[in-house]
Every structure is written in structure tokens, then in C-alpha cells.
A protein has these predicted regions:
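Short alpha-helix at the nucleotide-sugar/activated-sugar donor binding site of glycosyltransferases
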Residues: 146-147
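Conserved metal-binding segment of the jelly-roll/cupin
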Residues: 150
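A short acidic, glycine-rich active-site loop
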Residues: 112-121
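Domain-scale signature associated with acetyltransferase and cell-envelope carbohydrate enzymes
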Residues: 1-99, 120-126, 132-138, 143, ...
Length: 188
């Protein structure tokens, strides 16, 4: 493994602050985590828990910046060959894929201009990506937003904070809504 891992947290580092491969959900195999770094960098800015059956892959020039209180339940596929940034308090549900590259560039027929194969991804603070979301290059999600199950995020979302997006591709469905993690207990 090449590359680097940095921990930047005021107040110091403590045992158990970063947990990778945690067995959270028995619906997925307890296979830990696959971690591949080809020379890039991962920065942890506080507590982080990434569940079992997950993969982190960082390319030679890739950069992943994970804000404090990051949580991904299980089977996260996180691939960076450019730049992915998560601000603080981001929650990721089951089986999400977040990738800042297509791995292939495309050429426009009319002009022969090339569409870049990569672009940064930015998930701002207090966002929640429900299960089975795909986040593609160039995605930017405002603070306190929710991406519904099976959503495809593929652009800079110029929407208000505290909005719900859904669909393939994801579009604005509702404003004035967010997940309050301090009041999130469901009683069945």
C-alpha cells in the first residue's frame, strides 16, 4: 500500500475513534473492509465508522477528506482518483457507491472537445444518503439534505439546505425536511 492516511482532530486521537469494517448489519457478510491506496491520501477529521463489506479505493492522485462524526452502515464503495469531501455529521445508508471518476473520458462529436473523466464530489454537513444511492463525479449536495433510496446523484444541486432529492437522476422533491439524528428513534 502506498499513499497516506492523516488524522486531524482537535483534542487528540483516541482508541476506537476510527472504525473500519464494523459488523453492523447481519444481512451482509462479515467480511470486514477492503482498503486500497495507490498513492493518494485519506484524511479523517474525527470519529468515523464504516461498516462491514465496504471498499475504499484511492488512486495515485486521489484524495478523500472525511469530516467528524461520519457513519456508513455497510457495503459502502468509496472510490477516489481525484477528490471526495464529506463535511461533518454525514450519514450513509446501506450499499452506496460514491465515485469521483468515470474511469473513461468521452469526446463530443460536434467539437471533438473532451469531457473530463473526473470531477470533485462534495457532501456538505448533516446530509443523509439512504440505501442504494450512487453518487457520481461533480456531485455537490447542500447541508442537511436527504437523498432517498435508489437515487442517482450526478450534479451540483443548487437547492436549499434541508431538502429531499430522489430519483434517477435525483431531483428536488421537497424542501424544509431533514434527518434529525438526535431524535431518530423509531418505535414499531
Amino acid at each position: 500500500m502506498k499513499g497516506g492516511v492523516k488524522i486531524c482532530k482537535s483534542g487528540g486521537v483516541r482508541f476506537g475513534m476510527i472504525i473500519l469494517g464494523k459488523y453492523n448489519v447481519p444481512l451482509y457478510p462479515n467480511s470486514g473492509i477492503t482498503f486500497q491506496n495507490r498513492g493518494g491520501e485519506i484524511v479523517f477529521r474525527g470519529e468515523c465508522s464504516i461498516g462491514n463489506a465496504s471498499v475504499i479505493s484511492v488512486g495515485e492522485k486521489g484524495h478523500i477528506d472525511i469530516g467528524a462524526n461520519f457513519s456508513a452502515t455497510t457495503s459502502l464503495k468509496l472510490v477516489s482518483f481525484h477528490k471526495i469531501t464529506f463535511e461533518e455529521n454525514v450519514l450513509i445508508g446501506w450499499n452506496n457507491t460514491i465515485c469521483d471518476t468515470d474511469f473513461h473520458q468521452l469526446t463530443l462529436v460536434e467539437s471533438t472537445n473532451i469531457i473530463p473523466a473526473y470531477a470533485p464530489v462534495l457532501i456538505r454537513k448533516n446530509c443523509w444518503l439512504a440505501q442504494n444511492c450512487i453518487v457520481q463525479k461533480g456531485t455537490e449536495l447542500p447541508s442537511y439534505c436527504v437523498a432517498a433510496t435508489n437515487s442517482l446523484l450526478n450534479k451540483k444541486y443548487g437547492i436549499p439546505s434541508k431538502s429531499l432529492i430522489a430519483g434517477q437522476p435525483a431531483v428536488l422533491k421537497k424542501t424544509g425536511i431533514y434527518r434529525d439524528c438526535k431524535n431518530d428513534k423509531v418505535i414499531y
